[in-house]
Amino acid sequence: MKLYIMRHGEANYPQGSYSDRERRLTTNGEHEVTTTAKWLIDKQPKVDCVYVSPYIRAQQTASILLSHLKTGQKQNCDDITPDGHAGSVVSWLAAEIQQHGYESVVLVSHMPLVSYLVHELDASVQPPIFPTAGIAVVDFSPETLRGKFQQLLIAERCAG
């Protein structure tokens, strides 16, 4: 099955009383997400489910993504925040995929978790540094909890 691990778009830094959870996408971040979403719909027009962090910038990213994709559903997941545990997320995600018979899934999250997830799935790959709105493409086997990293896409390359 295809697993797309996506980092949220560029976000403002927390100011004043705003917490990290409340950071919002910048105008550039919205553009980045739109660009990578268009690439994704060309490669994978139907996605079974989009799993998304509860943080505002990830929710905004998922909303833009979902406006371009044909998808069965969106599901919030409290475990895919920046300090989530990659091994636990992979086990949980594999169970979800097997339970529902999904063939393609997008996970919208944050650094450093997105980087650790790629390495957890494919230990032959060093944890990549994700740019904002970057998408890692992984062929994932939920039965073995392993995957094969295919590529890391960035908005600038998707636009060209």
Could you tell me what each predicted segment is?
Residues 2-84, 114, 125-133:
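Active-site-proximal alpha-helix that buttresses catalytic centers in soluble enzyme cores
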Residues 3, 101-109, 113:
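Generic beta-sheet signal
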Residues 81-97:
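Short phosphate-binding loop-to-helix
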Residues 115-117, 158-159:
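Short, well-ordered, mixed-charge alpha-helical segments that flank or form enzyme active sites
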Residues 122-150, 155-159:
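Domain-level recognition of soluble alpha/beta enzyme cores
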